[in-house]
Each structure stands twice: as C-alpha cells, then as structure tokens.
C-alpha cells in the first residue's frame, strides 16, 4: 500500500516499545479523529468539547505520536431498545458535517503533495500593537524569518521584499464589502448573528474604506504576506488577545474569508502566537458553530512555534488543526552584577568571611549592608520591614544579589532555519528548514519538539 494520507480513529498512542508505529511505515501524514463517548447533544453543548478521558485517548496521546488532529467524527446515541434484554446500548453516531470537514481538510493536505508552487499566506502577528514591535513573536525575529521562509520554500525573491516592516505599515490589499457580504453566506447562522450583534454595520468597521476592506498585506510571487488583523479595537487589544468569549470584528472575519476565497493552499503563521486559535468556541473537537473552525476552514496551517511553549502550541494543534514546527529559542547570555550593586556584593562577601571570626566587624558590616541595601531600594523591592530580623534580612539580600548575578536572559532573536549566533546549531537550523519544506509538500513530519 502507498496511501497519500491516513485517517486514524484508534485511540491512545500507536507506538510500540521500540518507538515505531505501523502507521508511520508508509511515511504518509496521519490525521487523528476523535470518537466522543458523550451523547451528541452533550457534545454540542460542551464548552470543553471532550471529556478529560476522551481528550487523553483521542487527542493528547496521538499528539505525542505526531498525529495531526483533524476533528471529531462521532458521538454516542442510544440504539433501538432490545425487547428481550430490555436494554438499549449506546452506539457511535456519525456527525456528518464534521466528517465532511475532516475529509476536506485531509484533501487540502493531499493537494499540497501535487502542487509545485503552493499559494501560501504568511501571517505575522500584530501583538502587542506598538509600531516598533510589529510582527512580534516569542523568541523569533518574525520579519527576518519571513524572508527566510520565502527563500527556503521557493515562494519568491526575498530581496524584493525590501523594508518589509515598513511596507506592512503602509501597503494594503483590498477586498470589496460586496464580496465579503456574499462570503458571509458560508458562515453558520449562529456565528452570523453573533457577528452583527457584536459589531453591527459592516461599513463602520475600522478596516473598511471606500467600500472595501483594507488589509495590511503585500503579494510576492506565490506568497501573500500579511499582518493578522485586530480581533477588535486597538484600545482593547490586550484584553482581546486571549479572550475566548469576544466575537471577532468584521475586518478579522473578512480577512480569513478572503484567504479562503482565493483558494489559498497553505497558511504559515510565523511565530508564537496569533489570535485565530483563541477565538470563541469549544476547547477541542470544535463544531461548525466555533469561530476558529469557521475562519480556518480546511486550509492547512503550518505554525513555526518556540519549543519551550508547548502549552500554547497545543491550543493551535487542537483548535485550528495546526502543524506546529518547533524552533529553537534565542541563545542565553549570562547576566552580571550591575555596577551599582558591586559595593553591596563586596560587603556581603566580607560579611561571609567575618561571620564567626570577628563578631564586632561582622556587626558593623551587617549595619553597612542594611544601609546600602536601603539606599539602593533593594529592601523596598524585597518587602523587608525595618524591624525584621537581621539574619533574615541579610539572607534575603544575599539571595537577591546572587540571583541577579547568576541569571540568564535571551540574547537577541532567532531567525527560523538560520544560525545567527555562535555554537553548533546546524542540526536545528536544517531541521527547521526541512520541516517547513516537507510540510508545504503535504508530507509526514516525524514527531518532535
């Protein structure tokens, strides 16, 4: 057999003691579906989507195997009562529209295998909304990573991007309100009602000018590069970002319907993290009445994500069926004692030497340390009251100075698929580049960070 894709409905992990799985033998991508043990009506009304047991069996453990979660396909309903047994057993009942979503989602991934030049949307975050932090991503230089992805995936000439950050603040691509209104017919009626109840007239949307939506975006070859629109108003951005209850505005909804209307082959969200996976809806096993499902549609989503944030990466995997590609964090630099704290550190060292050997000198040093710590504001920062025990105060001051001296911090930002600092990172850089190319070809990627 040479399948182009595998849809797996078995639960738990599919790996043996040697770490291999028969599902991986053909090197085809494996899509995991969930069979809920709840009744259909209970699933429809459940905010969590799946029970803890179903989540573990059908999502979490297959996720560790590297399966792409494609959605829920069935829940349970009582069968016809057996009159002899006086018992009606529960049977799995297909959820037809969710099966259709799984099929279309898998079809789009398969289509990538036969597309030499996929139309790819590269999406950059706008959080936290300051001009100097455009395209923010945790630990990732998203602007330079965008250039690298354009080059590595053969989407266009990265040099033609010029000053990408500046261009994204000045250039726009448009979509008419008329086309948007027509596309809204594809949005489930419940979501349609929520949208207009929350945001009213389309013409009043912040992204609408002269009868069209103005998206911060530009086209380069097969790549569409865009800033992810605001979920709501800029002034409420911080509150909106992780809010699972706020309905997105017309401009946000229009952006993703626009991508669907252009038959986008793949979407690459560059870096942790965006807002699509945080829209209202179920936590997992989404229905068609969940905003992430309606806006992501069946477009394959590839998501370079920092490896040390698996919790938020799981949100993208489970709510928008994203394939996350782990990237290494920036290198760590060693901190040092600030100049203003050097005299305090010296006094603490002297105190350690005098303690137990010269009580009079020790007491003088103790007073000097307290006085200096107070003048530097250290005691205030640590909440040390004036009447606190001297020994406790010195212990806390010493621990504070040591923590500062021994701390490590991120030095710069990582560029996806590149080695931008000293050290042998060639394996990680190669893995990132290869993972991106493989994903855009619709092929299987082995599990890993």
Feature-to-residue mapping (PLM):
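Ligand/cofactor-recognition surfaces for anionic moieties
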Residues: 1-449
């Amino acid at each position: 057999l040479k399948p182009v894709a595998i849809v797996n409905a078995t639960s738990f992990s599919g790996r043996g003691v040697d770490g291999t799985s028969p599902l991986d033998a053909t090197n085809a991508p494996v899509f995991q579906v969930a069979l809920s043990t709840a009744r259909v009506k209970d699933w429809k009304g459940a905010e969590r989507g799946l029970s803890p047991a179903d989540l573990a069996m059908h999502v979490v453990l297959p996720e560790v195997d590297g399966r792409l979660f494609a959605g829920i396909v069935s829940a349970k309903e009582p069968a016809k009562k057996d009159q002899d047994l006086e018992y009606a057993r529960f049977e799995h009942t297909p959820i037809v529209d969710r099966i259709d979503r799984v099929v279309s989602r898998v079809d789009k991934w398969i289509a990538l295998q036969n597309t030499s030049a996929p139309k790819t949307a590269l999406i950059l975050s706008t959080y936290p909304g300051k001009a100097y932090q455009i395209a923010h991503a945790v630990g990732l230089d998203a602007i330079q990573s965008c250039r690298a992805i354009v080059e590595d995936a053969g989407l266009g000439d990265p040099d033609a991007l010029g000053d990408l950050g500046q261009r994204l603040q000045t250039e726009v691509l448009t979509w008419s309100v008329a086309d948007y209104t027509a596309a809204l017919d594809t949005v489930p009626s419940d979501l349609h009602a929520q949208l207009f109840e929350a945001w009213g007239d389309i013409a009043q949307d912040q992204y609408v000018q002269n009868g069209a939506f103005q998206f911060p975006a530009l086209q380069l070859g097969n790549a569409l590069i865009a800033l992810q629109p605001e979920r709501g108003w800029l002034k409420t951005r911080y509150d909106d970002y992780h809010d699972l209850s706020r309905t997105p505005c017309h401009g946000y909804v229009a952006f993703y319907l626009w991508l669907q209307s252009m038959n986008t082959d793949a979407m690459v969200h560059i870096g942790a993290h965006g807002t699509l996976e945080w829209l209202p809806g179920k936590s997992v096993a989404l229905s068609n009445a969940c905003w992430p499902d309606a806006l992501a549609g069946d477009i394959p989503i590839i998501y370079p994500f920092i490896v040390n944030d698996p919790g938020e990466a799981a949100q993208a995997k489970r709510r928008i069926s994203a394939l996350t590609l782990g990237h290494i964090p920036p290198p760590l630099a060693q901190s040092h004692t600030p100049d203003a704290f050097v005299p305090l550190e010296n006094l603490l060292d002297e105190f350690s030497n005098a303690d137990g050997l010269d009580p009079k000198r020790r007491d003088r040093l103790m007073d000097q340390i307290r006085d200096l710590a107070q003048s530097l504001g250290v005691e205030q920062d640590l909440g040390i009251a004036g009447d606190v025990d001297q020994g406790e105060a010195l212990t806390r001051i010493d621990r504070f100075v040591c923590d500062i001296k021994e701390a490590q911090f991120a030095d710069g930002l990582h560029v996806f698929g590149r080695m931008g600092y000293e050290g042998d990172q060639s394996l990680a850089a190669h893995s990132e580049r290869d993972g991106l190319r493989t994903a855009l070809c619709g092929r299987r990627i082995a599990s890993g960070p």
